Amino acid sequence: MASQQGGYPPQEGYGQPAGYGSPTQQHAGMAAGAPVQGHAGGKKKRAYAGEAFEIGSGANAALGGQLPAGGSYGAYPPQPQAAGYQQPVYGADPSQMNAAAPGYTAPVTPGIAQMTQQFGAMGVTDPHLMPPQPPQAAVAPQAPRPVPLNQLYPTDLLTQPFNVAELDYPPPPIVLPPGTSVYPSPTANCPPKYVRSTLNAVPTTHSLLKKSKLPFALVIQPYASLRDAEDPIPVIPDQVISRCRRCRSYINPFVTFLDHGHRWRCNMCNLTNDVPQAFDWDAALQKPADRSLRPDLNHAVVEFVAPQEYMVRPPQPLVYLFLIDVSYASVTNGLLATSARCIKESLDRIPNADRRTRLGFIAVDSSLHYFSIPRDGSENSDPRMLVISDLDEPFLPIPGDLLVTLSECRENIETFLDKLQEMFQNTQNNGCAMGSALRAGYKLIAPVGGKMTVLSSSLPNVGHGSLTMREDKKVLGTSKESSLLQTANSFYKSFAVECSKAQVSVDMFLFSSQYQDVASLSNLPRYTGGQTYFYPGWNAARGEDAIKFAREFSEYLSSEIGLEAVLRVRATTGLRMNTFYGNFFNRSSDLCAFPAFPRDQAYVVEVAIDETVTKPIVCLQTAVLHTTCNGERRIRVLTLALPTTQNLADVYASADQQAIATYFSHKAVERVLSSGLEPAREALQAKAVELLSTYRKELAGGSVSGGGLQFPANLRGLPVLFLAMIKNLGLRKSAQIPTDMRSAALCLLSTLPLPLLIQYIYPKMYSLHDMPDIAGLPDEQTGEIVLPPPVNLSSERIVPYGLYLIDDGQTQFLWVGRDAVPQLLLDVFGLPDRSQLRVGKQNLPELDNDFNQRVRAVIEKSRDHRSKGVGSIVVPHLYVVKEDGEPGLRLWAQTMLVEDRADQSVSLVQWMGSLREKV
């Protein structure tokens, strides 16, 4: 099985899920339909002799394309459809075949909600520009107010089922009163890709927030790419930084100028401050500047170059210390050779504009091997290896030569990396003293700070922080399983806190085919602003494995991280930052410390309402003080303004379902680590029931008309996302999930940026055999590859002759139906016969035909993080899965179909029914 699956651990063959309605059974009855009449509209683009075509069947039948402008929330008009690869010979009545469930009915005025969404996406929030809201569609009479907020559109979750396309809608628009910002700039408010609030209309009192049962939290992702050039924002170089004397907020587009512009009133605490003398002076041109053009008054997201007083010490250089496992396991699976080659090939990509970047290397087996690398041009250019066997108190031999400047030693670093593999190629050493190596590395870089990058294939089994094999298959799926997700050795938490104080960050790259205790090791990244990257069953002999790691590690090394960073969130008087979630160390009640600030993670901050808010808007300002890779101290400031309301209907109508799901993902991980898996799953279900009950009681008049399940249009996806979370690898009830897989999933659930997290919880599925003609080709306007419309994750949407891509952002599956026609297999795989199709990890062949090129374009576009507005190093593996092929692989792919019944979990229909009963 391992060979077929390409390294997926053998124990990961999920047991045959009880009641997993296999696509085979679900479609068996459809083959007996009437013979197909007619042909595909005369299209000759893909005329396959002997193939019957139909328009309007298959998963894309009811979707057929992107949502047209003016379409209403949830109503998906049919589109012109490509004649796809359909079933061979036998026909099926298209009316029975997988027609997508109809969207819920439009509001009384067609298209209002969709237009509202589109205005929100464009940043148009002036109420005079908003379409008139239909009073007859509103729920609960509203108190008169100067600006109408978003309307509440009730829908029935049972009669109008969730459609996956709803997850692609922008959040409810932020509707601010006119004249809120000091200048009418379209960029005055923070875009959702940087900061999203769970509530886009904020209750004025704690009691109203409590009554709503909704969380008030921010999802913060200060960077939308791995490198500045990919997502430039305004940088203010003049070092004139105007801050409030009392609350220390930064001047922003929502302040008010007084006294002929000589003073400004803080929009957080109302204090009046003097405008700095140099505020209206252009230092570069040495002449007065136009204040209305200042970036900090027009842009919600800006970066200030910080003056001397923002530094505790001079900006430190970028330091990478590589701790490389050279034990028998690491040499035999190819990790040592692959990582050495990859570092060598990425030396030009490591940020080094200021030519101060420093590198160091420690090799680890049962001893520690330090390497002294001479400068280029030295008499002796050979690296020297120094072996330390005292693991309890590892000392630093000649510490001055162990961290070398990349620019000065470039050639000799390459020489060293070429020789590293040879030094250990005959090893039989099974020891791994990684804990002691971390201690030694800490001593080496603590004076300057930096990153320790661990590359390991073994369980640390000697020296500091040694761990034992504690996974017991008998406890998997039981209440005792949660203990395996806790840290086994207190060293990892206490050492992580030490690292954080010395500005040392740790990233873990873990490659074991055996148990590696990810639960313990992941504490190091968790408290130091790092990340855990997990490669189960990895082996460089499989080209796909080697290429995936090489691409990801090269991206990792080229990322422009921030150093010595702190993050703080300030807000309007009456609001308080309550709890922080993410990978960092909480240094004080409101200060998060990051020895290195990554660009591929998001953070969640829960907000408390301590006092009644009297203003029509509140502001929340995130500031990240950091040193760039190039040695410049900067402050990235992100300011978000939100309207306030005393009306519960407004709160619900402006709630952001994806931000709420992200908040509860972090809460669920916290609950797993503190109380266990079952309490976390129960808490999610209880929350879903509580929200539905509150809405019914407070806003739907308490009635249960016709046995429905009422919820607002903008939150329709929330119950589905909760179910998908409960079924995620990190939380799912199962006796088949290895502890390391689960721990790695929990790391993702608590760090992924919002778009990637939602996709990880509710993966994307695209029907490829019948995708629209424009799919897989560049859009005429944007040049971006067009994706087919997404399909709900249910086996009812899968036809036996179909080809589907299922993608959760970490792994991609190409599902080939058991009745796929030969021409489809020939076009996509270049194989005339289905029996020749190899399953498992692979890359699609590049063939000279239109359809193969489009399928490959869709697969590649689905991996494109930049178009999602996030940075990520991940390159998902592609697994080819045959519907009637290798069972373990097929069952793994089917766990992505979160709307189906599986293993020990319910289907979406059963879940909605149980929520209905409890409500």
From Swiss-Prot:
The keyword Chloroplast does not apply. GO terms for cellular component: cis-Golgi network; COPII vesicle coat; endoplasmic reticulum exit site; endoplasmic reticulum membrane; equatorial cell cortex; Golgi membrane. GO terms for molecular function: SNARE binding; zinc ion binding. It is a peripheral membrane protein. CDD domains: Sec24-like. Residues 1-43 are annotated as: Disordered. Pfam families: Gelsolin (PF00626), Sec23_BS (PF08033), Sec23_helical (PF04815), Sec23_trunk (PF04811), zf-Sec23_Sec24 (PF04810). Residues 1-21 have a biased composition (Low complexity). One of its GO terms (biological process) is COPII-coated vesicle cargo loading. InterPro entries: ADF-H/Gelsolin-like_dom_sf, Gelsolin-like_dom, Gelsolin-like_dom_sf, Sec23/24_helical_dom, Sec23/24_helical_dom_sf, Sec23/24_trunk_dom, Sec23_24_beta_S, SEC23_SEC24_subfamily. It is found in: Cytoplasm; Cytoplasmic vesicle, COPII-coated vesicle membrane; Endoplasmic reticulum membrane; Golgi apparatus membrane. Belongs to the SEC23/SEC24 family. SEC24 subfamily. This is Protein transport protein sec24. The lineage of its organism: Eukaryota, Fungi, Dikarya, Ascomycota, Pezizomycotina. The gene is sec24.
